[in-house]
């Protein structure tokens, strides 16, 4: 196993521990707490994949961070912060919408890259909107936290989420996953609309009304792809 992979995991575990202590003091805002929960799942998946104990890794990560801080001057820290591009966290969904339980009568699932797409293909003739929480850097989607499809009544009927065991995805990965989700939902004559935030940063091949256009042939192809890979 590559030593950089191990040390990276160890540092991530310790930094998550620090953020958790911060949150325990009720100092974190909603995006901070959201990322904390998502990163916890990711660390568990990575630990399982690497065969590493999280508690042991956290202690090792603490030693690495302490060593770095001992060598770090205040001036060097200022220069580092100034040179790092800042990402923004954008939220379409409230915490309630992100944590809302849902179940599928006709579950369909597809994994594309490091993203998992789930949808209920029992949903028919509904008006559906896609909402997402994600970070943006250089005016492009950086990291998808969670994307969900909602009916007008607020029911969750679809979802795109990163796989904890396979961290890392690109803007194109997200666009492809959105296309698959939309194709699957529109197969049953649902009308699918994309939020303005998603249109701007992650799904630009859409009409102004937020309803991406898919020819019938492409819709059928997408739906068959989902069914064949479940």
Swiss-Prot record:
CC terms in the record's Gene Ontology section: host cell cytoplasm; host cell nucleus
Disordered, as annotated region: 206-230
Annotated spans, RNA-binding and homodimerization: 1-73
UniProt xrefs under InterPro entries: NS1, NS1A, NS1A_effect_dom-like_sf, uS15_NS1_RNA-bd_sf
Subcellular location as annotated: Host nucleus; Host cytoplasm
Residue ranges of the region described as CPSF4-binding: 180-215
Extent of motif Nuclear export signal: 137-146
One record GO biological process: symbiont-mediated suppression of host cytoplasmic pattern recognition receptor signaling pathway via inhibition of RIG-I activity
Record key words, sorted: Eukaryotic host gene expression shutoff by virus, Host cytoplasm, Host gene expression shutoff by virus, Host mRNA suppression by virus, Host nucleus, Host-virus interaction, Inhibition of host innate immune response by virus, Inhibition of host interferon signaling pathway by virus, Inhibition of host PKR by virus, Inhibition of host pre-mRNA processing by virus, Inhibition of host RIG-I by virus, Inhibition of host RLR pathway by virus, Interferon antiviral system evasion, RNA-binding, Ubl conjugation, Viral immunoevasion
Annotated signal sequence range: none
Source taxon at top rank: Viruses
GO-annotated molecular function: protein serine/threonine kinase inhibitor activity; RNA binding
PTM remark: Upon interferon induction, ISGylated via host HERC5; this results in the impairment of NS1 interaction with RNA targets due to its inability to form homodimers and to interact with host EIF2AK2/PKR.
Record note on quaternary structure: Homodimer. Interacts with host TRIM25 (via coiled coil); this interaction specifically inhibits TRIM25 multimerization and TRIM25-mediated RIGI CARD ubiquitination. Interacts with human EIF2AK2/PKR, CPSF4, IVNS1ABP and PABPN1.
Family classification: Belongs to the influenza A viruses NS1 family.
Function: Inhibits post-transcriptional processing of cellular pre-mRNA, by binding and inhibiting two cellular proteins that are required for the 3'-end processing of cellular pre-mRNAs: the 30 kDa cleavage and polyadenylation specificity factor/CPSF4 and the poly(A)-binding protein 2/PABPN1. In turn, unprocessed 3' end pre-mRNAs accumulate in the host nucleus and are no longer exported to the cytoplasm. Cellular protein synthesis is thereby shut off very early after virus infection.
Protein name: Non-structural protein 1
Gene that produces this protein: NS
């Amino acid at each position: 196993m590559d030593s950089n992979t191990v040390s990276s995991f160890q540092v991530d575990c310790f930094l998550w521990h620090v953020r958790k202590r911060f949150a325990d003091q009720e100092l974190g805002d909603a995006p901070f707490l959201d990322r904390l929960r998502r990163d916890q799942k990711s660390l568990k998946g990575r630990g399982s994949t690497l065969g590493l104990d999280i508690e042991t890794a956290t202690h090792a990560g603490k030693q690495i961070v302490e060593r770095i801080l001992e060598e770090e001057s205040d001036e060097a820290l200022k220069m580092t912060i100034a040179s790092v591009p800042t990402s923004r966290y954008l939220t379409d969904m409230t915490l309630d919408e992100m944590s809302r339980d849902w179940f599928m009568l006709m579950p369909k699932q597809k994994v594309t890259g490091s993203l998992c797409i789930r949808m209920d293909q029992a949903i028919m003739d509904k008006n559906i909107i896609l909402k997402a929480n994600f970070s943006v850097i250089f005016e492009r989607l950086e990291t998808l936290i969670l994307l969900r499809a909602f009916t007008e009544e607020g029911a969750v009927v679809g979802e795109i989420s990163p796989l904890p065991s396979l961290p890392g995805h690109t803007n194109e990965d997200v666009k492809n996953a959105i296309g698959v989700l939309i194709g699957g939902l529109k197969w049953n004559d649902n009308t699918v609309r994309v939020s303005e935030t998603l249109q701007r940063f992650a799904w630009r091949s859409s009409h102004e009304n937020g309803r991406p256009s898919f020819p019938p042939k492409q819709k059928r192809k997408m739906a068959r792809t989902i069914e064949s890979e479940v």
